[in-house]
Curated annotation (Swiss-Prot):
Record: residues binding substrate: L169, I170, S171, G172, G173, D202, G222, E226, S329, N330, T357
Stored Pfam families: TsaD
Family stated for the protein in its record: Belongs to the KAE1 / TsaD family.
Species this protein is from: Homo sapiens
The protein's name in its UniProt record: tRNA N6-adenosine threonylcarbamoyltransferase, mitochondrial
Length: 414
């Protein structure tokens, strides 16, 4: 979603009485003895209030989520104070639903894991404040979670994936390529120099007024573009992928957005319609934008694979590429990445679409991973703060660019 403002402020702090009443609402019968680790994960980094209970074997014992998509579609993007208020209104209910569904008493939890970075400050604050109150009442360890690390490691919940592996994280707020060498060991190969791909898709969908399209009125921008693109001609407009001559693994999407805006303005004049009306060529525009984005993602990822293999950071055969984040739920982009992995003797793995978007399961699982590895488990919660901006791992993107790797052309027959 498009972020309309960057409001900062003091985060919501639930009263101790409310948390105490919340805990008293659980009346579990004794008898079940949990012999393994169980983590409650809480996610409020953007516009989804989510919670889940996961055990160390990867079983999802309970989950709940409240999506704000419908509200933000009406405002044309996420308004942080509005998102904060919706998190406040729903977080207690969502956590309670996840715990109730799991059948796990709060006292039987091994730890509580919560997203504290990166994300919208006001949204992060709600989740952190609620979690710290809960941790204080239950006297449980607290595990701070990096949102993008959680996306990267989700695949280890659904598939047996060993380190190292390459991950492409693509969402509404992020776009990066990283080598995952361990639970908390990441090498950043490239990132977006401007906006994220999901943000760009939302802006294009908004400019095309797809919320007025009868088939797309309840869809997020990215989903609307993917849906409409199936009906369009991806070659109707000639748009070159961004950073075509830059031999690194960085991404850029503002140029693609601006070119698309010009095409839309031109077509509006040709069709004699005003801004805000649906173009007859909307499906062709959606298909072209989606295809161009896919080609851009593939080329940068191709270079990352070649770089990692040249430096023996990945095995020469059967290396794993993981695509995660909300945009990775786009099946056209997945098929494009499959063409790449087939050409480079790699294996493409993607979490199920529902685990690509923000969710509590990935946060709880990241907590399990850290609990097993003994990393970042806090018993003293004094001074913990959320971090709206936070890099991922060690940045070696300059080294990647200096390698100046030429990428062979691939036939994108999708």
């Amino acid at each position: 979603m498009l972020i309309l403002t960057k409001t900062a402020g003091v985060f919501f702090k639930p009263s101790k009485r409310k948390v105490y009443e919340f805990l008293r609402s659980f009346n579990f019968h004794p008898g079940t003895l949990f012999l393994h680790k169980i983590v409650l994960g809480i996610e409020t980094s953007c516009d989804d209030t989510a919670a889940a209970v996961v055990d160390e074997t990867g079983n999802v014992l309970g989950e709940a989520i409240h999506s704000q998509t419908e509200v933000h579609l009406k405002t044309g993007g996420i308004v942080p104070p509005a998102a904060q208020q919706l998190h406040r209104e729903n977080i207690q209910r969502i956590v309670q639903e996840a715990l109730s569904a799991s059948g796990v008493s709060p006292s039987d939890l091994s730890a509580i894991a919560t997203t504290i970075k990166p994300g919208l400050a006001l949204s992060l604050g709600v989740g952190l404040s609620f979690s710290l109150q809960l941790v204080g009442q239950l006297k449980k360890p607290f595990i701070p979670i990096h949102h993008m690390e959680a996306h990267a490691l989700t695949i280890r919940l659904t598939n047996k994936v060993e380190f190292p592996f390459l991950v492409l994280l693509i969402s509404g707020g992020h776009c990066l390529l990283a080598l995952v060498q361990g639970v908390s060991d990441f090498l950043l190969l490239g990132k977006s120099l401007d906006i994220a791909p999901g943000d760009m898709l939302d802006k294009v969908a908004r400019r095309l007024s797809l919320i007025k399209h009868p088939e797309c009125s309840t869809m997020s921008g990215g989903k609307a573009i993917e849906h409409l693109a199936k009906q369009g001609n991806r070659f109707h407009f000639d748009i070159k992928p961004p950073l075509h001559h830059a031999k690194n693994c960085d991404f850029s999407f503002t140029g693609l957005q601006h070119v698309t805006d010009k095409i839309i303005m031109k077509k509006e004049k040709e069709e004699g319609i005003e801004k805000g009306q649906i173009l007859s060529s909307a499906a062709d525009i959606a298909a072209t934008v989606q295809h161009t984005m896919a080609c851009h993602l593939v080329k940068r990822t191709h270079r990352a694979i070649l770089f990692c293999k040249q430096r023996d950071l990945l095995p020469q055969n059967n290396a794993v590429l993981v695509a995660s984040g909300g945009v990775a739920s786009n099946f056209y982009i997945r098929r494009a990445l499959e063409i790449l992995t087939n050409a480079t003797q790699c294996t493409l793995l993607c979490p199920p679409p529902r685990l690509c978007t923000d969710n509590g399961i990935m946060i709880a699982w990241n907590g399990i991973e850290r609990l097993r590895a003994g990393l970042g488990i806090l018993h003293d919660i004094e001074g913990i703060r959320y971090e709206p901006k936070c890099p991922l791992g060690v940045d070696i993107s300059k080294e990647v660019g200096e390698a100046s790797i030429k990428v062979p052309q691939l036939k994108m027959e999708i």
